[in-house]
Regions:
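N-terminal Rossmann-like FAD-binding beta1-loop-alpha1 element of flavoenzymes
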Residues: 5-33
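Conserved Rossmann-like nucleotide-cofactor binding loop
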Residues: 15, 39, 288
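Glycine-rich FAD pyrophosphate-binding loop
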Residues: 24-50
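Mid-domain catalytic core of redox enzymes
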Residues: 26, 258-371
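Conserved FAD-binding subdomain of flavin-dependent enzymes
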Residues: 43-46, 52-91
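Mobile amphipathic helical/loop "lid" adjacent to a hydrophobic cofactor/ligand pocket
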Residues: 73, 77-206
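Helical element adjacent to the flavin cofactor pocket in flavoenzyme catalytic cores
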Residues: 214-266
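Conserved flavin/dinucleotide-binding core of flavoenzymes
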Residues: 347-457
């Protein structure tokens, strides 16, 4: 491809900013990033709020309203840190306590813990043997029993691998069925904590591929030992601010794309009322929104209209002064589809500080079931805080996210990803972002990295 090609990138979240970074590294410098909001980072959003430090003084510190953490297999994020001059070494230590909804500790017997550990080891072994290739970034080929892409294992460190494994077709079934098929149902709790509680859905609805690609056997062990998790003192948003700041062409903020016309081997982009002409287009925002502002072909309409997402919101809340807990709480009783709309987790960010905002996490939809209305879920979450002994005095802010775009088990099995991947480059258009991999920072950046390798090398 011509290194002077003019490239339009839509969206300055992790997918878009990292795509620009990898394009620069590959020798492409004639790009523009359009971001409709006034900041970069997408769901990596870390606003400043008042926290009472160890000396009893109020000071401004970052609070995470979206992305929170990483781990040792965040190889692509580490490349972004290096490029942008940020680090996770100064972040606050993670901690958690498993609680009942009434605020008393959730006790587990030694037998229960042993069963959980045995099933976790069994499932990890199965994933690494029977389902070899399961952890490769992205989804192309999975429904056909193939794997192809960067492998994020500690040994491979994003090296490209590919191969055939017919067993991978089973990853299209719901994760609950996948566990049952492999007689590993007791592993549910191990995977549920970092998956359902952070808004990615319930195991009876979500294809197993999403679960095990995000929480591969190494990563899930990292989540179990919170001391190994990465956090950022200046917030996850600082990673993408750092990348953006070091780009030759930082994102153009407050720049909304309202029209796209692809014709005569060019891409005409209407942004803030003006038309710009490009040679290539990389869409790093929700693909189904392209149906509104773009000029979608029939195949794009058919495929992108199948994308689903999660109704998930976070609230920064304050308890009465002096009643702030000293650690995050997880409520496994509320991580079921019957209890959607209830509080699943609140995140206590700063262990060295006293009173501070807590961030609540609530999921309110399930495929094929009625959504819990936002107002009801908000009020229920506040009641749940009171029930566990942490009554909320003030709500600092609420972020109602467009969250975890994905496809159903049926559409996954029917080759949705293979069909979309076959369109890459058609009409000079490339697709990236969360739905092409998974809705977390690392998976999304890995995909942008691999997209550049595949098509802009």
């Amino acid at each position: 491809m011509d290194k002077n090609a003019r490239i339009c990138i839509i969206g300055a979240g992790p997918a878009g900013t990292s795509a620009a970074m990898y394009l620069e590294k590959a020798g492409y410098e004639n790009y523009v990033i359009y971001e409709k909001s006034g900041r970069v980072g997408g769901k990596a959003f870390s606003p400043m709020m008042k926290v009472k430090n160890a000396h009893g003084q109020w000071e401004d510190r970052t609070i995470e309203m979206g992305a929170v953490m990483g781990c040792e297999t965040y190889f692509a994020v580490a490349e972004c840190e290096q490029f942008g001059g940020t680090t996770h070494l100064d972040g606050p230590a993670m901690g958690r306590r498993f609680m009942k909804v009434d605020g008393t500790p959730q006790e587990s017997s030694k037998l229960e813990l042993l069963k959980k550990f045995i099933k976790m080891k069994k499932l990890s072994h199965l994933l690494e043997t029977k389902y070899k290739g399961y952890d490769v970034n992205g989804h192309r080929g999975v429904s056909q029993g193939r794997y192809e892409g960067p492998c994020p294992s500690p040994k491979m460190k994003l090296q490209h691998i590919e191969g055939e494994n017919p067993n991978l077709k089973e990853l299209s079934m719901p994760f609950s069925e996948f566990l049952k098929r492999n007689k590993c149902e007791d592993a549910t709790l191990v995977w549920k904590g970092p998956f359902t509680s952070f808004g990615y859905g319930y195991f009876d609805e979500i294809p197993a591929a999403y679960v095990v690609k995000y929480l591969d056997s190494f990563t899930v062990r990292q989540f179990l030992s919170t001391g190994k998790l990465w956090t950022w003192k200046n917030g996850t948003q600082s990673i993408w601010e750092g990348v953006n700041r070091h780009l030759k062409h930082p994102a153009q903020l407050n720049s909304e794309v309202t029209g796209i016309t692809r014709k005569d081997d060019k891409v005409y982009v209407t942004v803030n009322g003006s038309v710009e002409v490009f040679d290539k287009l990389i869409v790093c925002t929700p693909l189904e929104l392209f149906l509104n502002y773009g000029d979608p072909r029939e195949e794009e309409k058919e495929l992108f209209s199948k994308i689903q997402h999660k109704e998930y919101f976070t609230m920064a809340v304050r308890t009465e002064e002096g009643n702030c807990p000293d650690i995050s709480y997880y409520f496994f009783e509320n991580m079921t589809n019957e209890t959607r709309g209830h509080l699943m987790v609140f995140y206590h960010r700063w262990p060295d500080a006293g009173d501070q905002p807590l961030v609540t996490f609530t999921l309110r939809n399930h495929e094929g079931m009625e959504d819990v209305p936002f107002e009801l879920a908000r009020d229920t979450t506040l009641k749940d805080m009171e029930l566990c002994g942490k009554k909320v005095e003030t709500v600092e802010r609420i972020d109602d996210w467009y969250y975890f775009p994905h496809v159903s088990c049926k559409d996954y099995a029917d080759g949705w990803y293979e069909k979309v991947e076959a369109m890459q480059g058609k009409d000079n258009t490339f697709y990236a972002g969360e739905v092409m991999s998974f809705g977390d920072m690392e998976e999304t950046v890995e995909y942008s990295r691999d997209l550049v390798r595949r098509f802009f090398a």
